[in-house]
Amino acid sequence: MVQTEIQKNFSHMNDMQKQAVFCTEGPLLILAGAGSGKTTVLVNRIAYILQCELCKPWQILAITFTNKAAGELKERICAAVPEGGADIWAATFHSTCARILRRYGDRIGYTSHFTVYGTDDQKKLVKDILKQLNIAEKTLPVKSILSEISKAKDKMLTPEEMRKEAEFDSRKAQIAKVYEIYQTKLKTADAMDFDDMLCNTVKLFETAPDILDYYRNQFKYIMVDEYQDTNKVQYKFVSLLASKYGNICVVGDDDQSIYKFRGATIENILSFENTFKNAKMIRLEQNYRSTQNILNAANEVISNNTMRKGKTLWTENGQGEKIKVHTAENERDEANFIAQTILDGVADGRKYSDYAILYRMNAQSNAIEQALSRSGVPHRVIGGHRFYDREEIRDMVAYLQVINNPHDDVRLSRIINVPKRGIGATTVSHAADIAAGLGESIYDVIKEAENYPQLSRASAKLKAFVALIDGLIEAEQSGEYSLAELYNLVIEHTSYEQYLKTEKDNPEVRIENIEELSSNIVKFEEDYGDESDLSAFLEEISLQTDIDNYDADADTCVMMTLHSAKGLEFPVVFIAGMEEGMFPSVATMMNPDELNEERRLAYVCLLYTSPSPRDYAAS
Protein backbone atom coordinates (compact mmCIF):
# COMPACT_ATOMS: atom_id res chain seq x y z
CA MET A 1 0.00 0.00 0.00
CA VAL A 2 1.49 3.40 -1.00
CA GLN A 3 1.94 6.09 1.65
CA THR A 4 -0.85 8.30 0.27
CA GLU A 5 -3.32 5.44 0.69
CA ILE A 6 -2.06 4.68 4.20
CA GLN A 7 -2.47 8.35 5.15
CA LYS A 8 -6.23 8.03 4.68
CA ASN A 9 -6.26 5.85 7.82
CA PHE A 10 -5.44 8.96 9.86
CA SER A 11 -8.30 11.20 8.75
CA HIS A 12 -9.63 11.37 12.34
CA MET A 13 -6.72 13.63 13.34
CA ASN A 14 -6.51 17.40 12.96
CA ASP A 15 -4.27 18.92 10.29
CA MET A 16 -1.30 19.71 12.55
CA GLN A 17 -1.45 16.29 14.19
CA LYS A 18 -1.38 14.65 10.75
CA GLN A 19 1.62 16.77 9.74
CA ALA A 20 3.46 15.50 12.82
CA VAL A 21 2.51 11.88 12.07
CA PHE A 22 3.54 11.99 8.39
CA CYS A 23 6.85 13.83 8.97
CA THR A 24 9.00 10.75 9.61
CA GLU A 25 12.46 11.65 8.31
CA GLY A 26 15.02 13.91 9.95
CA PRO A 27 14.93 15.81 13.27
CA LEU A 28 11.46 16.98 14.33
CA LEU A 29 10.29 19.05 17.29
CA ILE A 30 6.59 18.66 18.04
CA LEU A 31 5.74 21.66 20.22
CA ALA A 32 2.72 20.14 21.94
CA GLY A 33 0.54 22.28 24.17
CA ALA A 34 -1.19 20.66 27.15
CA GLY A 35 -4.18 18.54 26.15
CA SER A 36 -3.29 18.69 22.46
CA GLY A 37 -3.23 14.91 21.95
CA LYS A 38 0.52 14.38 21.94
CA THR A 39 0.26 10.72 23.02
CA THR A 40 -2.23 10.14 20.21
CA VAL A 41 0.29 11.70 17.82
CA LEU A 42 3.13 9.51 19.12
CA VAL A 43 1.07 6.32 18.86
CA ASN A 44 -0.18 7.15 15.36
CA ARG A 45 3.27 8.24 14.21
CA ILE A 46 4.67 4.85 15.24
CA ALA A 47 1.72 3.08 13.59
CA TYR A 48 2.28 5.07 10.37
CA ILE A 49 6.02 4.24 10.30
CA LEU A 50 5.25 0.53 10.70
CA GLN A 51 2.35 0.50 8.22
CA CYS A 52 4.64 2.14 5.66
CA GLU A 53 7.25 -0.54 6.48
CA LEU A 54 9.94 2.08 7.05
CA CYS A 55 11.54 -0.14 9.70
CA LYS A 56 11.00 -3.17 11.93
CA PRO A 57 9.19 -2.67 15.28
CA TRP A 58 12.37 -3.30 17.30
CA GLN A 59 14.06 -0.43 15.44
CA ILE A 60 11.82 2.11 17.19
CA LEU A 61 12.77 3.59 20.57
CA ALA A 62 10.11 5.65 22.39
CA ILE A 63 11.25 7.26 25.65
CA THR A 64 8.90 8.66 28.30
CA PHE A 65 9.47 10.01 31.81
CA THR A 66 7.37 7.67 33.97
CA ASN A 67 6.73 3.93 33.98
CA LYS A 68 3.01 4.71 33.95
CA ALA A 69 3.34 6.74 30.74
CA ALA A 70 5.56 4.08 29.17
CA GLY A 71 3.04 1.35 30.01
CA GLU A 72 0.13 3.34 28.57
CA LEU A 73 2.10 4.15 25.43
CA LYS A 74 3.04 0.49 24.90
CA GLU A 75 -0.57 -0.59 25.47
CA ARG A 76 -1.90 1.90 22.90
CA ILE A 77 0.81 0.97 20.39
CA CYS A 78 -0.08 -2.73 20.72
CA ALA A 79 -3.76 -1.88 20.17
CA ALA A 80 -2.93 0.21 17.08
CA VAL A 81 -0.35 -2.24 15.72
CA PRO A 82 -1.30 -5.78 16.87
CA GLU A 83 1.46 -7.29 14.73
CA GLY A 84 4.82 -6.35 16.23
CA GLY A 85 3.70 -3.57 18.56
CA ALA A 86 5.05 -5.45 21.58
CA ASP A 87 8.57 -5.45 20.07
CA ILE A 88 8.93 -1.67 20.21
CA TRP A 89 11.23 -0.29 22.91
CA ALA A 90 8.86 1.95 24.92
CA ALA A 91 10.38 2.79 28.29
CA THR A 92 11.75 5.50 30.56
CA PHE A 93 15.31 6.80 30.22
CA HIS A 94 16.33 4.80 33.30
CA SER A 95 14.67 1.57 32.15
CA THR A 96 16.26 1.89 28.72
CA CYS A 97 19.70 2.48 30.23
CA ALA A 98 19.22 -0.37 32.71
CA ARG A 99 18.41 -2.74 29.85
CA ILE A 100 21.59 -1.75 28.02
CA LEU A 101 23.76 -1.91 31.16
CA ARG A 102 22.41 -5.32 32.22
CA ARG A 103 23.69 -6.59 28.88
CA TYR A 104 26.97 -4.71 28.50
CA GLY A 105 27.79 -3.26 31.94
CA ASP A 106 30.73 -5.66 32.27
CA ARG A 107 32.55 -3.46 29.73
CA ILE A 108 32.74 -0.71 32.37
CA GLY A 109 33.20 -2.94 35.40
CA TYR A 110 29.67 -3.93 36.52
CA THR A 111 27.96 -7.31 36.62
CA SER A 112 24.53 -7.92 35.13
CA HIS A 113 23.20 -8.09 38.72
CA PHE A 114 24.21 -4.54 39.69
CA THR A 115 22.02 -2.89 42.32
CA VAL A 116 20.19 0.42 41.91
CA TYR A 117 20.36 2.66 44.99
CA GLY A 118 17.32 4.76 45.82
CA THR A 119 17.28 7.94 47.93
CA ASP A 120 17.33 6.19 51.32
CA ASP A 121 20.25 3.98 50.27
CA GLN A 122 22.16 7.04 49.05
CA LYS A 123 21.56 8.86 52.33
CA LYS A 124 22.78 5.88 54.36
CA LEU A 125 25.92 5.65 52.25
CA VAL A 126 26.70 9.38 52.55
CA LYS A 127 26.11 9.30 56.33
CA ASP A 128 28.63 6.46 56.62
CA ILE A 129 31.15 8.47 54.58
CA LEU A 130 30.68 11.57 56.75
CA LYS A 131 31.43 9.46 59.83
CA GLN A 132 34.50 8.07 58.10
CA LEU A 133 35.72 11.62 57.35
CA ASN A 134 34.71 12.98 60.79
CA ILE A 135 32.47 15.60 59.19
CA ALA A 136 29.38 16.66 61.17
CA GLU A 137 26.06 16.43 59.31
CA LYS A 138 25.15 19.89 60.64
CA THR A 139 28.03 21.48 58.75
CA LEU A 140 27.45 19.45 55.58
CA PRO A 141 23.85 18.17 55.34
CA VAL A 142 23.35 14.87 53.53
CA LYS A 143 20.61 16.32 51.32
CA SER A 144 22.92 19.13 50.14
CA ILE A 145 25.73 16.68 49.37
CA LEU A 146 23.47 14.44 47.30
CA SER A 147 22.07 17.46 45.46
CA GLU A 148 25.59 18.63 44.54
CA ILE A 149 26.63 15.13 43.46
CA SER A 150 23.51 14.86 41.28
CA LYS A 151 24.23 18.25 39.69
CA ALA A 152 27.79 17.14 38.98
CA LYS A 153 26.56 13.96 37.32
CA ASP A 154 24.03 15.93 35.27
CA LYS A 155 27.05 17.79 33.87
CA MET A 156 29.02 14.51 33.67
CA LEU A 157 31.68 15.83 36.05
CA THR A 158 33.94 13.29 37.78
CA PRO A 159 34.91 13.80 41.45
CA GLU A 160 38.33 15.03 40.29
CA GLU A 161 36.74 17.57 37.92
CA MET A 162 34.40 18.70 40.69
CA ARG A 163 37.40 19.17 43.01
CA LYS A 164 39.18 21.31 40.39
CA GLU A 165 36.03 23.40 39.93
CA ALA A 166 35.93 24.01 43.69
CA GLU A 167 39.28 25.89 43.66
CA PHE A 168 39.20 27.91 46.91
CA ASP A 169 35.68 26.80 47.93
CA SER A 170 36.46 24.54 50.90
CA ARG A 171 32.84 23.39 51.24
CA LYS A 172 32.67 22.24 47.63
CA ALA A 173 36.09 20.59 48.00
CA GLN A 174 34.72 18.58 50.95
CA ILE A 175 31.71 17.53 48.87
CA ALA A 176 34.07 16.48 46.06
CA LYS A 177 35.92 14.26 48.55
CA VAL A 178 32.62 12.70 49.69
CA TYR A 179 31.68 12.26 46.02
CA GLU A 180 34.96 10.42 45.35
CA ILE A 181 34.47 7.97 48.24
CA TYR A 182 30.75 7.65 47.37
CA GLN A 183 31.58 6.50 43.84
CA THR A 184 34.26 4.11 45.09
CA LYS A 185 31.85 2.50 47.55
CA LEU A 186 29.13 2.23 44.91
CA LYS A 187 31.54 0.48 42.55
CA THR A 188 32.71 -1.91 45.28
CA ALA A 189 29.07 -2.75 46.02
CA ASP A 190 28.37 -3.31 42.30
CA ALA A 191 25.77 -0.55 42.61
CA MET A 192 24.65 2.60 40.83
CA ASP A 193 22.37 5.47 41.73
CA PHE A 194 19.80 6.79 39.24
CA ASP A 195 22.17 9.41 37.82
CA ASP A 196 24.84 6.75 37.29
CA MET A 197 22.50 4.72 35.11
CA LEU A 198 22.42 7.54 32.58
CA CYS A 199 26.06 8.62 32.98
CA ASN A 200 27.36 5.06 32.78
CA THR A 201 25.40 4.35 29.61
CA VAL A 202 26.87 7.44 27.96
CA LYS A 203 30.30 6.40 29.29
CA LEU A 204 29.75 2.92 27.83
CA PHE A 205 28.88 4.39 24.42
CA GLU A 206 31.90 6.70 24.48
CA THR A 207 34.41 4.04 25.57
CA ALA A 208 32.98 1.11 23.60
CA PRO A 209 32.23 2.38 20.07
CA ASP A 210 31.18 -1.10 18.95
CA ILE A 211 28.29 -1.04 21.44
CA LEU A 212 27.29 2.48 20.40
CA ASP A 213 27.34 1.30 16.77
CA TYR A 214 25.14 -1.67 17.67
CA TYR A 215 22.43 0.50 19.22
CA ARG A 216 22.53 3.40 16.77
CA ASN A 217 22.27 0.88 13.95
CA GLN A 218 19.31 -0.72 15.72
CA PHE A 219 17.28 2.42 16.43
CA LYS A 220 16.29 3.93 13.12
CA TYR A 221 13.55 6.05 14.71
CA ILE A 222 13.86 7.65 18.14
CA MET A 223 11.06 9.52 19.91
CA VAL A 224 11.37 11.35 23.22
CA ASP A 225 8.35 12.59 25.16
CA GLU A 226 8.45 15.53 27.63
CA TYR A 227 11.68 16.76 26.04
CA GLN A 228 11.52 20.01 28.02
CA ASP A 229 12.28 17.95 31.15
CA THR A 230 15.53 16.42 29.87
CA ASN A 231 18.95 17.22 31.32
CA LYS A 232 22.37 17.38 29.68
CA VAL A 233 23.14 13.67 30.11
CA GLN A 234 19.80 12.65 28.60
CA TYR A 235 20.42 14.98 25.66
CA LYS A 236 23.85 13.39 25.18
CA PHE A 237 22.33 9.89 25.33
CA VAL A 238 19.68 10.48 22.64
CA SER A 239 21.99 12.52 20.41
CA LEU A 240 24.53 9.66 20.41
CA LEU A 241 21.81 7.14 19.52
CA ALA A 242 20.43 9.37 16.75
CA SER A 243 23.84 10.13 15.25
CA LYS A 244 23.52 7.59 12.40
CA TYR A 245 20.00 7.97 10.97
CA GLY A 246 19.15 11.40 12.38
CA ASN A 247 15.48 10.46 12.76
CA ILE A 248 14.91 11.95 16.19
CA CYS A 249 11.45 13.26 17.07
CA VAL A 250 11.08 15.10 20.37
CA VAL A 251 7.74 16.06 21.83
CA GLY A 252 7.55 18.77 24.44
CA ASP A 253 6.49 22.23 25.48
CA ASP A 254 8.98 24.81 26.71
CA ASP A 255 6.13 26.47 28.63
CA GLN A 256 5.79 23.29 30.72
CA SER A 257 9.45 23.11 31.80
CA ILE A 258 9.08 23.01 35.61
CA TYR A 259 11.83 20.66 36.81
CA LYS A 260 14.92 22.88 36.85
CA PHE A 261 15.46 21.87 40.48
CA ARG A 262 15.93 18.26 39.27
CA GLY A 263 18.51 19.24 36.68
CA ALA A 264 16.19 19.73 33.68
CA THR A 265 17.53 22.30 31.25
CA ILE A 266 15.03 24.23 29.14
CA GLU A 267 17.85 25.01 26.69
CA ASN A 268 17.54 21.48 25.24
CA ILE A 269 14.15 22.28 23.73
CA LEU A 270 14.80 25.97 23.02
CA SER A 271 17.96 25.16 21.02
CA PHE A 272 16.71 21.99 19.31
CA GLU A 273 16.61 23.53 15.82
CA ASN A 274 20.16 24.85 16.21
CA THR A 275 21.49 21.59 17.67
CA PHE A 276 20.02 19.24 15.07
CA LYS A 277 20.69 20.27 11.48
CA ASN A 278 17.65 20.75 9.19
CA ALA A 279 15.22 20.26 12.10
CA LYS A 280 11.54 21.03 11.59
CA MET A 281 9.03 22.27 14.18
CA ILE A 282 5.28 21.60 14.24
CA ARG A 283 2.98 23.29 16.76
CA LEU A 284 -0.01 21.50 18.31
CA GLU A 285 -2.19 24.28 19.73
CA GLN A 286 -5.71 22.83 19.70
CA ASN A 287 -6.61 21.73 23.24
CA TYR A 288 -9.08 18.86 23.75
CA ARG A 289 -9.08 18.89 27.56
CA SER A 290 -9.98 22.33 28.91
CA THR A 291 -12.43 25.10 28.14
CA GLN A 292 -11.58 28.47 26.62
CA ASN A 293 -11.85 30.37 29.91
CA ILE A 294 -9.15 28.17 31.39
CA LEU A 295 -6.98 28.47 28.28
CA ASN A 296 -7.33 32.25 28.21
CA ALA A 297 -6.05 32.45 31.78
CA ALA A 298 -3.16 30.10 31.05
CA ASN A 299 -2.22 31.92 27.82
CA GLU A 300 -2.27 35.25 29.66
CA VAL A 301 -0.05 34.00 32.49
CA ILE A 302 2.61 32.53 30.21
CA SER A 303 2.63 35.47 27.78
CA ASN A 304 4.61 37.41 30.41
CA ASN A 305 7.57 35.04 30.05
CA THR A 306 10.60 35.77 27.89
CA MET A 307 12.71 33.22 25.98
CA ARG A 308 9.94 30.95 24.73
CA LYS A 309 8.93 29.38 21.41
CA GLY A 310 5.47 30.89 21.62
CA LYS A 311 2.05 29.39 20.99
CA THR A 312 -1.58 30.11 21.82
CA LEU A 313 -3.83 27.30 23.01
CA TRP A 314 -7.42 27.23 21.77
CA THR A 315 -10.33 24.80 21.95
CA GLU A 316 -13.71 23.96 20.46
CA ASN A 317 -15.02 22.92 23.91
CA GLY A 318 -16.75 26.25 24.52
CA GLN A 319 -16.13 28.97 27.10
CA GLY A 320 -16.95 26.87 30.19
CA GLU A 321 -17.13 28.11 33.76
CA LYS A 322 -14.98 30.99 34.92
CA ILE A 323 -12.14 30.40 37.33
CA LYS A 324 -13.37 30.98 40.87
CA VAL A 325 -11.27 32.74 43.48
CA HIS A 326 -11.91 32.20 47.18
CA THR A 327 -10.20 34.54 49.63
CA ALA A 328 -9.59 32.80 52.94
CA GLU A 329 -8.82 34.30 56.35
CA ASN A 330 -6.05 31.81 57.06
CA GLU A 331 -4.91 28.29 56.14
CA ARG A 332 -7.49 26.67 58.45
CA ASP A 333 -10.31 28.66 56.83
CA GLU A 334 -8.93 27.73 53.40
CA ALA A 335 -8.80 24.03 54.33
CA ASN A 336 -12.36 24.04 55.71
CA PHE A 337 -13.61 25.73 52.53
CA ILE A 338 -11.99 23.02 50.40
CA ALA A 339 -13.47 20.20 52.51
CA GLN A 340 -16.97 21.72 52.51
CA THR A 341 -16.89 22.39 48.76
CA ILE A 342 -16.02 18.74 48.13
CA LEU A 343 -18.84 17.55 50.41
CA ASP A 344 -21.31 19.87 48.62
CA GLY A 345 -20.14 18.62 45.22
CA VAL A 346 -20.49 14.96 46.21
CA ALA A 347 -24.00 15.69 47.54
CA ASP A 348 -24.79 17.10 44.07
CA GLY A 349 -23.65 13.90 42.36
CA ARG A 350 -19.92 14.27 41.91
CA LYS A 351 -17.38 11.60 42.95
CA TYR A 352 -14.61 12.21 45.44
CA SER A 353 -12.14 11.21 42.74
CA ASP A 354 -13.22 14.24 40.68
CA TYR A 355 -11.26 16.46 43.07
CA ALA A 356 -7.57 17.27 43.27
CA ILE A 357 -6.00 19.62 45.81
CA LEU A 358 -2.66 21.04 44.71
CA TYR A 359 -0.15 23.08 46.67
CA ARG A 360 3.27 24.64 46.10
CA MET A 361 4.95 23.08 49.15
CA ASN A 362 4.38 19.89 51.15
CA ALA A 363 4.18 21.98 54.34
CA GLN A 364 0.77 23.25 53.17
CA SER A 365 -0.77 19.78 53.20
CA ASN A 366 -1.17 19.30 56.97
CA ALA A 367 -4.05 21.75 57.54
CA ILE A 368 -5.88 20.49 54.45
CA GLU A 369 -5.46 16.83 55.41
CA GLN A 370 -6.77 17.54 58.91
CA ALA A 371 -9.84 19.34 57.51
CA LEU A 372 -10.59 16.47 55.13
CA SER A 373 -10.25 13.92 57.94
CA ARG A 374 -12.55 15.91 60.25
CA SER A 375 -15.11 16.18 57.45
CA GLY A 376 -14.96 12.49 56.55
CA VAL A 377 -13.66 13.16 53.03
CA PRO A 378 -11.68 10.13 51.77
CA HIS A 379 -8.33 11.30 50.47
CA ARG A 380 -4.89 10.15 49.48
CA VAL A 381 -1.63 12.10 49.64
CA ILE A 382 0.49 11.45 46.56
CA GLY A 383 4.12 11.65 47.57
CA GLY A 384 3.31 10.42 51.06
CA HIS A 385 4.47 7.14 52.61
CA ARG A 386 5.05 4.82 49.66
CA PHE A 387 4.41 1.10 50.03
CA TYR A 388 8.05 0.30 49.30
CA ASP A 389 9.20 2.77 51.97
CA ARG A 390 7.59 0.82 54.81
CA GLU A 391 10.09 -0.72 57.22
CA GLU A 392 9.04 -4.33 56.77
CA ILE A 393 8.91 -4.00 52.98
CA ARG A 394 12.36 -2.43 52.89
CA ASP A 395 13.64 -5.34 55.03
CA MET A 396 12.23 -7.97 52.67
CA VAL A 397 13.43 -6.13 49.56
CA ALA A 398 16.88 -5.81 51.18
CA TYR A 399 17.01 -9.60 51.57
CA LEU A 400 16.11 -10.01 47.90
CA GLN A 401 18.72 -7.40 46.93
CA VAL A 402 21.43 -9.22 48.90
CA ILE A 403 20.46 -12.54 47.30
CA ASN A 404 20.78 -10.83 43.91
CA ASN A 405 23.98 -8.97 44.83
CA PRO A 406 25.64 -9.97 48.13
CA HIS A 407 28.22 -7.18 47.70
CA ASP A 408 25.53 -4.52 48.30
CA ASP A 409 26.88 -3.25 51.65
CA VAL A 410 23.99 -0.87 52.36
CA ARG A 411 21.29 -3.55 52.05
CA LEU A 412 23.44 -6.19 53.76
CA SER A 413 24.05 -3.86 56.74
CA ARG A 414 20.30 -3.35 57.00
CA ILE A 415 19.43 -7.04 57.39
CA ILE A 416 22.53 -8.60 58.93
CA ASN A 417 20.88 -8.36 62.38
CA VAL A 418 17.20 -8.34 61.32
CA PRO A 419 15.73 -10.41 62.89
CA LYS A 420 18.22 -10.17 65.77
CA ARG A 421 21.13 -12.61 65.49
CA GLY A 422 23.46 -11.14 68.09
CA ILE A 423 25.49 -9.29 65.45
CA GLY A 424 25.90 -5.81 66.93
CA ALA A 425 26.57 -2.45 65.29
CA THR A 426 30.19 -2.52 66.51
CA THR A 427 30.83 -5.82 64.72
CA VAL A 428 29.29 -4.49 61.50
CA SER A 429 31.39 -1.32 61.83
CA HIS A 430 34.57 -3.40 62.24
CA ALA A 431 33.65 -5.46 59.17
CA ALA A 432 32.98 -2.29 57.17
CA ASP A 433 36.36 -0.80 58.17
CA ILE A 434 38.19 -4.00 57.19
CA ALA A 435 36.30 -4.10 53.88
CA ALA A 436 37.12 -0.44 53.14
CA GLY A 437 40.81 -1.07 53.84
CA LEU A 438 40.90 -4.08 51.52
CA GLY A 439 38.69 -2.58 48.81
CA GLU A 440 36.27 -5.47 49.26
CA SER A 441 32.63 -5.81 50.28
CA ILE A 442 31.42 -6.57 53.81
CA TYR A 443 30.16 -9.92 52.54
CA ASP A 444 33.66 -10.87 51.35
CA VAL A 445 35.04 -10.02 54.80
CA ILE A 446 32.46 -11.81 56.96
CA LYS A 447 32.83 -14.98 54.88
CA GLU A 448 36.35 -15.15 56.36
CA ALA A 449 35.42 -13.70 59.76
CA GLU A 450 37.64 -16.11 61.69
CA ASN A 451 40.70 -14.58 59.98
CA TYR A 452 40.15 -11.14 61.50
CA PRO A 453 40.77 -10.61 65.26
CA GLN A 454 38.17 -7.81 65.41
CA LEU A 455 35.50 -10.28 64.26
CA SER A 456 36.61 -13.44 66.05
CA ARG A 457 34.06 -13.24 68.90
CA ALA A 458 31.17 -12.90 66.45
CA SER A 459 32.58 -15.19 63.77
CA ALA A 460 30.16 -18.08 64.43
CA LYS A 461 27.14 -15.76 64.13
CA LEU A 462 28.56 -14.09 61.04
CA LYS A 463 29.23 -17.45 59.40
CA ALA A 464 25.67 -18.55 60.20
CA PHE A 465 24.36 -15.42 58.47
CA VAL A 466 26.59 -16.09 55.46
CA ALA A 467 25.28 -19.68 55.33
CA LEU A 468 21.70 -18.34 55.32
CA ILE A 469 22.41 -15.96 52.44
CA ASP A 470 24.44 -18.53 50.49
CA GLY A 471 21.59 -21.03 50.84
CA LEU A 472 19.10 -18.50 49.47
CA ILE A 473 21.47 -17.56 46.63
CA GLU A 474 21.80 -21.25 45.77
CA ALA A 475 18.01 -21.62 45.77
CA GLU A 476 17.64 -18.61 43.45
CA GLN A 477 20.30 -19.85 41.04
CA SER A 478 19.02 -23.44 40.99
CA GLY A 479 16.03 -22.50 38.83
CA GLU A 480 13.82 -24.76 40.95
CA TYR A 481 11.87 -21.93 42.57
CA SER A 482 9.60 -19.26 41.16
CA LEU A 483 10.21 -15.72 42.38
CA ALA A 484 7.20 -15.94 44.69
CA GLU A 485 8.48 -19.24 46.11
CA LEU A 486 11.91 -17.73 46.69
CA TYR A 487 10.29 -14.83 48.56
CA ASN A 488 8.42 -17.31 50.77
CA LEU A 489 11.72 -19.11 51.46
CA VAL A 490 13.17 -15.82 52.71
CA ILE A 491 10.25 -15.32 55.11
CA GLU A 492 10.45 -18.92 56.29
CA HIS A 493 14.24 -19.18 56.74
CA THR A 494 14.52 -15.84 58.54
CA SER A 495 11.44 -16.40 60.77
CA TYR A 496 10.49 -12.85 59.79
CA GLU A 497 6.78 -13.16 60.57
CA GLN A 498 7.56 -14.39 64.08
CA TYR A 499 9.94 -11.44 64.47
CA LEU A 500 7.12 -9.03 63.54
CA LYS A 501 4.76 -10.66 66.03
CA THR A 502 7.18 -10.47 68.95
CA GLU A 503 9.27 -7.36 68.24
CA LYS A 504 7.07 -4.85 66.39
CA ASP A 505 3.90 -2.86 66.99
CA ASN A 506 0.90 -3.41 64.67
CA PRO A 507 2.20 -6.85 63.58
CA GLU A 508 -1.06 -7.72 61.79
CA VAL A 509 -0.75 -4.70 59.49
CA ARG A 510 2.93 -5.41 58.85
CA ILE A 511 2.21 -9.06 58.01
CA GLU A 512 -0.53 -7.92 55.62
CA ASN A 513 2.07 -5.69 53.95
CA ILE A 514 4.57 -8.50 53.41
CA GLU A 515 1.71 -10.62 52.04
CA GLU A 516 0.84 -7.77 49.68
CA LEU A 517 4.45 -7.79 48.48
CA SER A 518 4.01 -11.50 47.77
CA SER A 519 0.92 -10.65 45.67
CA ASN A 520 2.93 -8.00 43.81
CA ILE A 521 5.59 -10.58 43.00
CA VAL A 522 2.98 -13.05 41.71
CA LYS A 523 1.48 -10.33 39.50
CA PHE A 524 4.94 -9.41 38.22
CA GLU A 525 5.55 -13.06 37.25
CA GLU A 526 2.19 -13.22 35.48
CA ASP A 527 2.87 -9.99 33.57
CA TYR A 528 6.47 -10.72 32.54
CA GLY A 529 6.46 -14.51 32.11
CA ASP A 530 9.89 -15.87 31.22
CA GLU A 531 11.52 -12.48 31.85
CA SER A 532 10.36 -12.36 35.49
CA ASP A 533 13.66 -13.08 37.22
CA LEU A 534 14.87 -11.54 40.48
CA SER A 535 17.00 -8.83 38.84
CA ALA A 536 14.08 -7.71 36.68
CA PHE A 537 11.72 -7.49 39.66
CA LEU A 538 14.19 -5.48 41.75
CA GLU A 539 14.80 -3.16 38.83
CA GLU A 540 11.06 -2.69 38.34
CA ILE A 541 10.44 -1.62 41.94
CA SER A 542 13.56 0.54 42.14
CA LEU A 543 12.37 2.59 39.15
CA GLN A 544 8.83 3.09 40.40
CA THR A 545 7.54 6.51 41.40
CA ASP A 546 4.50 7.34 43.48
CA ILE A 547 2.65 8.55 40.38
CA ASP A 548 3.21 5.13 38.76
CA ASN A 549 1.05 3.67 41.55
CA TYR A 550 -1.68 6.31 41.28
CA ASP A 551 -5.05 4.57 40.97
CA ALA A 552 -7.46 6.78 39.03
CA ASP A 553 -10.35 4.38 39.72
CA ALA A 554 -10.20 4.73 43.52
CA ASP A 555 -12.97 7.06 44.71
CA THR A 556 -10.84 9.34 46.86
CA CYS A 557 -9.78 12.92 46.32
CA VAL A 558 -6.04 13.37 45.91
CA MET A 559 -3.60 15.81 47.44
CA MET A 560 -0.21 16.51 45.89
CA THR A 561 2.31 19.19 45.07
CA LEU A 562 1.97 21.11 41.83
CA HIS A 563 5.08 19.37 40.48
CA SER A 564 3.77 15.88 41.33
CA ALA A 565 0.54 16.42 39.38
CA LYS A 566 2.27 16.82 36.01
CA GLY A 567 0.54 14.65 33.41
CA LEU A 568 -2.64 14.08 35.42
CA GLU A 569 -6.03 15.73 34.98
CA PHE A 570 -9.13 16.19 37.12
CA PRO A 571 -12.62 17.70 36.69
CA VAL A 572 -12.18 19.98 39.72
CA VAL A 573 -8.87 21.40 40.88
CA PHE A 574 -8.13 23.47 43.98
CA ILE A 575 -4.90 25.46 43.91
CA ALA A 576 -4.24 26.19 47.56
CA GLY A 577 -2.17 29.10 48.83
CA MET A 578 -2.04 31.02 45.54
CA GLU A 579 -0.75 34.17 47.16
CA GLU A 580 2.36 36.28 46.81
CA GLY A 581 5.15 34.81 48.89
CA MET A 582 3.71 31.30 48.72
CA PHE A 583 3.03 30.94 45.01
CA PRO A 584 5.02 32.63 43.59
CA SER A 585 7.44 31.81 46.39
CA VAL A 586 9.52 34.53 48.02
CA ALA A 587 12.74 32.95 46.76
CA THR A 588 11.74 33.38 43.10
CA MET A 589 10.39 36.91 43.10
CA MET A 590 13.73 38.74 42.73
CA ASN A 591 15.22 36.41 40.11
CA PRO A 592 13.83 36.73 36.54
CA ASP A 593 14.76 33.15 35.54
CA GLU A 594 13.21 31.71 38.70
CA LEU A 595 10.08 33.81 38.22
CA ASN A 596 9.79 32.54 34.64
CA GLU A 597 9.85 28.98 36.01
CA GLU A 598 7.22 29.92 38.61
CA ARG A 599 4.97 31.27 35.82
CA ARG A 600 5.44 28.04 33.89
CA LEU A 601 4.33 26.16 37.01
CA ALA A 602 1.22 28.35 37.26
CA TYR A 603 0.55 27.79 33.55
CA VAL A 604 0.83 24.02 33.94
CA CYS A 605 -1.39 23.78 37.02
CA LEU A 606 -4.14 25.82 35.33
CA LEU A 607 -4.22 23.14 32.63
CA TYR A 608 -4.79 20.16 34.98
CA THR A 609 -8.58 20.47 34.63
CA SER A 610 -10.78 18.25 32.43
CA PRO A 611 -13.49 18.24 31.13
CA SER A 612 -15.65 20.66 33.17
CA PRO A 613 -13.08 22.75 34.98
CA ARG A 614 -13.82 24.58 38.20
CA ASP A 615 -10.60 25.94 39.64
CA TYR A 616 -10.36 27.50 43.05
CA ALA A 617 -7.39 29.64 43.99
CA ALA A 618 -7.35 30.39 47.70
CA SER A 619 -5.42 33.38 48.96
Language-model segments: residues:
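Helicase P-loop NTPase motor core
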Residues: A34-L42, I46, K277-K280, E285-P378, ...
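Conserved phosphate/pyrophosphate-binding and hydrolysis machinery centered on Walker-type P-loop NTPases
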Residues: N14, I63, A90, T115-T119, ...
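Short alpha-helix plus adjacent loop in nuclease-associated cores
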Residues: C97-R102, Q256-Y259, G383-V402
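N-terminal pre-P-loop "Q-motif" helix
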Residues: F10-T24
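A basic/glycine-biased coupling hinge at the interface between accessory DNA-binding modules
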Residues: V2-K8, E25-L28, G33-S36, A47-Y221, ...
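Conserved helicase C-terminal RecA-like lobe
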Residues: F168, K351, S365-V377, R390, ...
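Conserved helicase motor core of SF1/SF2 NTP-dependent helicases
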Residues: S36, V224, Q228-M307, K311-E316, ...
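Short glycine-/polar-rich loops that comprise or flank the Walker A/P-loop
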Residues: C55-Q59, A86, K244-G246, D254-D255, ...
